[in-house]
Amino acid sequence: HVDSGKSTTTGHLIYKCGGIDKRTIEKFEKEAQEMGKGSFKYAWVLDKLKAERERGITIDIALWKFETAKYYVTIIDAPGHRDFIKNMITGTSQADCAVLIVAAGTGEFEAGISKNGQTREHALLAFTLGVKQLIVGVNKMDSTEPPYSESRFEEIKKEVSSYIKKIGYNPAAVAFVPISGWHGDNMLEASTKMPWFKGWNVERKEGKAEGKCLIEALDAILPPARPTDKPLRLPLQDVYKIGGIGTVPVGRVETGILKPGTIVVFAPANITTEVKSVEMHHEALQEAVPGDNVGFNVKNVSVKELRRGYVAGDSKNNPPKGAADFTAQVIVLNHPGQISNGYTPVLDCHTAHIACKFAEIKEKVDRRTGKSTEDNPKSIKSGDAAIVNLVPSKPLCVESFQEFPPLGRFAVR
């Protein structure tokens, strides 16, 4: 949610355990003082990084990472404002875990969780897009009445549990952590201000976990099974031109393995070329596996020929192709009116962003069972699920959800 304190919380984690060097931090602190922001805000870290990223400066990706005892955590920022939901859709589809930050302040929590609040929408999106692990940070515990109130935390935990359960999450498997991203309570170490908090604990079929702070909850994430045995699919997030090296597409391996020497094809443009090298965390890799965010250098292809939303695959093993049309199950989350044949919204699938026409609404189905409830409905509205034939304005690389989940889920808005 916009003011739940996501940036401050994230900034705090990057600041304390991340890839930001001392010099940069001192520079930020000095600027903050000069601007009369007496106290240095962690959110600033994120604002500075975002500003640089928006100016087209290739940010050293290390800045968007921090380390726990067990993992490298890469932050896929999903700011809370309405127009950012699209980023969230393309970004969330790459997340292994979502951290939902809710503000505990009087009135703040209620606003976020209200009928059209964003907390609700974000949690629903994360689940719909296949992010099955969730952590809830109950933030701004310092601004409850009285500060660090146990009853306020319990009230919020109860309320959030009930609605994430409706969405499909199992609350018993979700860590609820009372925090202050600003003061640092329960972020990296147990807070002395909440002696009543005995810790979070989760139960799931893979076993139990418990801890006191947010970083431990991140440490307790289960690493998802990585589909290395499937054909290669790597949606491009960006394409850089790097002096002395050449064209470097960047993206996350979703399925399969990418290694130097692979002859890749980029769909839907059908451009074929050889991979010269693969790099992650500034180190050359002999192979990249699902979950790896990598840059790879390709021969004889200019930056202009490739774009975000293209998908790289192995030309010799079930390569990806563009689709001129496709059939999908669509769930209408919150759309103001009726949707009928001919409706042409913008669709976001993996990293692609493209106008698509609802050519034919074939049937309405039950959201939970998928059974048909009505053939050829005139229109569909909020809450409905339907099977629809979609026609993208130009070829789009999509796959069946069964075979390649990250390329089989999308959002239209």
UniProtKB/Swiss-Prot annotation:
The modification 5-glutamyl glycerylphosphorylethanolamine is found at E287, E360. Belongs to the TRAFAC class translation factor GTPase superfamily. Classic translation factor GTPase family. EF-Tu/EF-1A subfamily. GTP binds at residues 1-7, 77-82, 139-142. This protein promotes the GTP-dependent binding of aminoacyl-tRNA to the A-site of ribosomes during protein biosynthesis. It comes from Spodoptera frugiperda. It is found in: Cytoplasm. The keyword Nucleotide-binding applies. Residues 1-228 form the tr-type G domain. NCBIfam families: EF-1_alpha, PRK12317.1. This is Elongation factor 1-alpha. Signal peptide: none annotated. CDD domains: EF1_alpha, EF1_alpha_II, EF1_alpha_III. The keyword Nucleotide-binding applies. One of its GO terms (cellular component) is cytoplasm. Keywords: Cytoplasm, Elongation factor, GTP-binding, Nucleotide-binding, Phosphoprotein, Protein biosynthesis. InterPro entries: EFTu-like_2 (IPR004161), G_TR_CS (IPR031157), GTP-eEF1A_C (IPR054696), P-loop_NTPase (IPR027417), T_Tr_GTP-bd_dom (IPR000795), TRAFAC_GTPase_members (IPR050100), Transl_B-barrel_sf (IPR009000), Transl_elong_EF1A/Init_IF2_C (IPR009001). GO terms for molecular function: GTP binding; GTPase activity; translation elongation factor activity.
